[in-house]
Amino acid sequence: MGKLIIVGTPIGNLEDITIRALKTLREVDLILAEDTRRTMVLLNKYRIKKPLLSFNERNSKKRIKEILPLLKEGKKVAIVSDAGMPVISDPGYNLVEECWREGIEVDIVPGPSALTSAVAVSGFPGSKFIFEGFLPRGKNRRRLLKSLKKENRVIVFFESPERLLSTLRDILEIIGDREVFIAREMTKLHQEFFRGKVSEAISHFEKKKPLGEITVVLSGKE
């Protein structure tokens, strides 16, 4: 039997890659990547030449049927996401699940995570929090926010720049004007941190159009 290795990669700054992650990517037989073009940038920087295969939400079922036989033949396969840890709001969980069912070894090479990085820098308590991934759209988002109104733990979620303002307006209306921390483009050239009331965040991003990858940390009910 081979081995599936879940490898964490940088969330922005490519220098945040770990020594063990580089060693692993150099040793495996195949690398599964959410977007092969983005992963190639990382591999080229560190002069790693390995076969790359796309693995995303659209093709995961097909890919699993191709990859399981390779693992059973003894191949070592790494899976990476575009940024951060695979499976965390990214493709991969179904492959990991199938490996466990088939008795194939699964290993982990931990790396950066936008989730934990945002909580750490937010100044909010990090001992208890909930993660909602990417919030749903429209009525489903409002329904979810209503269910979170009485949540006393810190709430963390990812959001797209196009939807950030509408999400913040829904939060203000449904949950209230709580303290919020917004991390944009973490570890990248145009990194931005904002902390203040939800109403202040709305004013800020109405004046300055949000761009890039965004993580939102919302304080819990007091």
UniProtKB/Swiss-Prot annotation:
PROSITE patterns: RSMI. Its EC number is 2.1.1.198. One of its GO terms (cellular component) is cytoplasm. It is found in: Cytoplasm. Belongs to the methyltransferase superfamily. RsmI family. HAMAP family: 16SrRNA_methyltr_I. It comes from Thermotoga maritima (strain ATCC 43589 / DSM 3109 / JCM 10099 / NBRC 100826 / MSB8). It catalyses: cytidine(1402) in 16S rRNA + S-adenosyl-L-methionine = 2'-O-methylcytidine(1402) in 16S rRNA + S-adenosyl-L-homocysteine + H(+). It comes from the Bacteria. CDD domains: RsmI. This is Ribosomal RNA small subunit methyltransferase I.
